[in-house]
Swiss-Prot record:
It comes from the Bacteria. S-adenosyl-L-methionine binds at residues 45, 70, 97, 119. Catalyzes the formation of N(7)-methylguanine at position 46 (m7G46) in tRNA. CDD domains: AdoMet_MTases. PROSITE patterns: SAM_MT_TRMB. The lineage of its organism: Bacteria, Bacillati, Bacillota, Bacilli, Lactobacillales. Its EC number is 2.1.1.33. This is tRNA (guanine-N(7)-)-methyltransferase. Residues 1-25 are annotated as: Disordered. Pathway: tRNA modification; N(7)-methylguanine-tRNA biosynthesis. The active site is at 119. Keywords: Methyltransferase, S-adenosyl-L-methionine, Transferase, tRNA processing. One of its GO terms (molecular function) is tRNA (guanine(46)-N7)-methyltransferase activity.
Length: 218
């Protein structure tokens, strides 16, 4: 969902190049170890919205590095404000298109990718834009380590069914799958980190679909 333009958020991104990259040149490799100041494992959320999910993870896991990849500059600015307000040194913001994922991260550089409530692009002519289309799966496979995982959540049953089929056809394995995440075991529910969108729709009784999937050995 596109957010209303907020000039302050756009300006904030421009004022903090040490914390946020605004559409960097894909031809120039990003030195993530230098940006984080360490070489801890990196986890990426592709499409971070207002950042509730990724900032919560960053607070919970100071031993990991996180990148919020968000194409909307206003959304990137909102996430950046949360990062700065909460002093999250293990979070970087990348305002860029996921189509350039491999250029920005390089091969075997990432331990986990989160896809939360991505645009379903329901029309068949837009299939290639879905973040679980085979071409995107190939990009994820390239940047993930051998045991890396994709964690995917959606409220859209059609996108979930499509994603299961797409990943299965790609030869991926599934470590977890649920068609009603918020009614799983207490342990699973407690470990789940909600997005803003997820909280809104789950509170109305909308089932949340979820899967964790990985690739066969490279």
């Amino acid at each position: 969902m596109r957010l209303k333009n907020k000039p302050w958020a756009n300006e904030l991104v421009e004022e903090h190049p040490e914390s946020a990259l605004d559409r960097p040149n894909p031809a120039e490799k990003i030195d993530w170890a230098a940006r984080f100041g360490n070489d801890k494992p990196i986890e990426i959320e592709v499409g971070s919205g207002k950042g509730q999910f990724i900032t919560t993870l960053a607070k919970q896991h100071p031993d990991r590095n996180f990148v919020a990849m968000e194409i909307q500059k206003t959304a990137a600015g909102i996430i950046l404000k949360k990062k700065l307000d909460e002093g999250l040194d293990n979070l970087q913001i990348l305002c860029a298109d996921a189509a350039n994922l491999v250029a920005y991260f390089g091969e075997n550089s990432t331990s986990k990718i989160y896809l939360n409530f991505s645009d379903p692009w329901p029309k068949s002519r837009h299939e290639k834009r879905r973040l679980t289309y085979k071409d995107f799966l190939a990009k994820y496979q390239a940047v993930l380590t051998g045991d890396g995982l994709i964690e995917f959540k959606t409220d859209n049953s059609g996108l979930f069914a499509y994603s299961v089929k797409s990943m299965n056809n790609y030869g991926m394995h599934f470590d977890f799958m649920s068609v009603d995440l918020h009614h799983e075991s207490e342990e699973i529910v407690e470990k789940n980190v909600e997005t803003e969108y997820e909280h809104k729709f789950a509170s109305k009784g909308q089932p949340i679909y979820c899967l964790h999937a990985g690739f066969l050995a490279k």
